[in-house]
């Protein structure tokens, strides 16, 4: 299973989540619309991992997307990969702070991974959308980081703290419901 991510260190988190969700739901696919797992936000059963662990591609040159490789091996074994909009994970957008050459090498991993798996194909090239977004996000990321630093905000810490407050509030709003879960 996999789902969208929210970039906790970028502004407009809601818009970013919606955009990420759209890209992953509609283009992050292979072999007739089979879901590709996203490494920062994926879960697989132990039995599925044991079935493919001896077959996943070793990548000593570090030129492939390991999560897509895992996805394609799972599909080879007939496992179903699913996408859940509710399975949201927070990650950093620091990749947007790299040079274009570094970003390009990272995007080449899509092509390299599928080249290593000639039995698989994709209708959409997700990296094309990411290339289109890169200049804007690359420009925005350091500006937003300066804003956060000037206000002494650690976005990951803030999200964690906000989640803790929500948990406490839900306990006091519905103490019997929380106690039933514990």
Kindly give the residue locations of the regions a language model identified.
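Terminal low-complexity segments of carbohydrate-biosynthetic enzymes
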Residues: 112-182
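Hydrophobic residues within well-ordered alpha-helices
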Residues: 73-75
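Conserved nucleotide-sugar donor-binding
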Residues: 37-53
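Acidic donor-binding loop at a coil-to-helix junction in glycosyltransferase catalytic cores
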Residues: 60-70
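Short, flexible, basic/aromatic active-site loop/helix in glycosyltransferases
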Residues: 2-7, 13-35
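A residue-level structural signature of the nucleotidyltransferase/glycosyltransferase Rossmann-like core
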Residues: 41, 63, 81-82
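Active-site donor/metal-binding and catalytic loop motifs
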Residues: 84-101
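A structural signal for short, well-ordered beta-strand segments and their strand-loop junctions
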Residues: 1-2, 82-84
């Amino acid at each position: 299973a996999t789902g969208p991510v929210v970039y906790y260190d970028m502004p407009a988190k809601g818009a970013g989540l919606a955009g990420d969700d759209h890209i992953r739901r509609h283009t992050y696919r292979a072999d007739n619309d089979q879901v590709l797992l996203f490494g920062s936000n994926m879960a697989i059963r132990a039995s599925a991992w044991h079935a493919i662990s001896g077959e996943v591609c070793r990548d000593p040159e570090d030129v492939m997307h390991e999560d897509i490789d895992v996805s394609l091996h799972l599909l080879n074994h007939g496992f179903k990969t699913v996408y859940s909009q509710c399975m949201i994970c927070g990650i950093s957008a620091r990749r947007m702070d790299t040079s274009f050459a570094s970003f390009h090498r990272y995007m080449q991993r899509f092509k390299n991974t599928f080249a290593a798996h000639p039995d698989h194909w994709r209708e959409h090239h997700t990296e094309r959308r990411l290339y289109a977004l890169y200049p804007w996000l690359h420009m925005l990321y350091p500006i937003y980081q300066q804003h956060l630093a000037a206000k002494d905000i650690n976005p990951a810490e803030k999200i964690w703290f906000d989640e803790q407050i929500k948990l406490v509030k839900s306990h006091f709003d519905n103490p019997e419901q929380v106690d039933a879960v514990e």
